[in-house]
Amino acid sequence: SEESNLCDLLRDYDKPAQEVIAEMTDGGVDR
């Protein structure tokens, strides 16, 4: 599924997942 692919991508990513998500969602999960 797309969601598990995203998790794999984040696992390989250099930045913390939250930072990546914040960039992709243009603001982040906490706002």
From Swiss-Prot:
Q: Which residues of this UniProt protein bind Zn(2+)?
A: C7
**What is catalyzed by this enzyme?**
a primary alcohol + NAD(+) = an aldehyde + NADH + H(+); a secondary alcohol + NAD(+) = a ketone + NADH + H(+)
Alphabetical UniProt keywords: Cytoplasm, Metal-binding, NAD, Oxidoreductase, Zinc
Q: What is its EC number?
A: 1.1.1.1
**UniProt-annotated location(s):** Cytoplasm
Keyword Metal-binding part of the UniProt annotation: yes
Paste the cofactor note: Binds 2 Zn(2+) ions per subunit.
| GO CC term, one of those recorded | cytoplasm
Organism domain of life: Eukaryota
Keyword presence, NAD:
yes
Q: Membrane spanning segments where?
A: none
Main location as per UniProt: cytoplasm
Q: Which family does it belong to?
A: Belongs to the zinc-containing alcohol dehydrogenase family. Class-P subfamily.
Which protein, by its recorded name, is this?
A: Alcohol dehydrogenase 1
Origin organism is: Catharanthus roseus (Madagascar periwinkle)
